[in-house]
Amino acid sequence: TSRGLGDVYKRQEVTGKSFIEVFRNEYGYLLDYVDGNMMDWSVRPNMIFAVAFDYSPLDRAQKKQVLDIATKELLTPKGLRTLSPKSGGYNPNYVGPQIQRDYAYHQGTAWPWLMGFYMEAYLRIYKMSGLSFIERQLIGLEDELTIHCISSLPELFDGNPPFKGRGAVSFAMNVAEVLRILKLLSKYY
């Protein structure tokens, strides 16, 4: 019924407003998580999903602010960092004993699979004018295809230069995201 759809649209609007009120901060990026009065102000890549997905409560200007911060603080030639160097606890090097590597995993290493969602977000904002930037970003990943495991990408990279590949030598999720982005780019050509 039309009344039922009205309720759905009303809930959608309320949910979107609530999302913005809870997660968007005055610096233009999204809080990583909120649990009651506890808020994580760390700049992390989770916020890029709110820009990349078809349906987002953010308007275009808000999406651009999130993308700009991700570009400045998280983007590397090999993927998005899991934590900004400006945030506390930054540890970009996936080295040492298992416990040390486990700590670094979410504290600044760069994950190639996140680059797919970043690129999708970039194209949502810049459309055709963003294509050359996206192609340049793919070069950083293309170079890796002959280094670790032929035609594959490693699990992650150190978050700082020289962005050394670490973890599993072949990680399907990373390869899948590159293929997904290449398919997305083919729609523009």
Regions found by a protein language model. Name each.
Residues 53, 121-124, 128, 181:
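Core register positions within helices of long alpha-helical scaffolds
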Residues 7, 126-129, 148:
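Short helix-adjacent coil turns
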Residues 14-111, 139-189:
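Extended glycan-interaction surfaces of carbohydrate-active proteins
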Residues 1-9:
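Single conserved hydrophobic/aromatic residue that forms the stacking wall/gate
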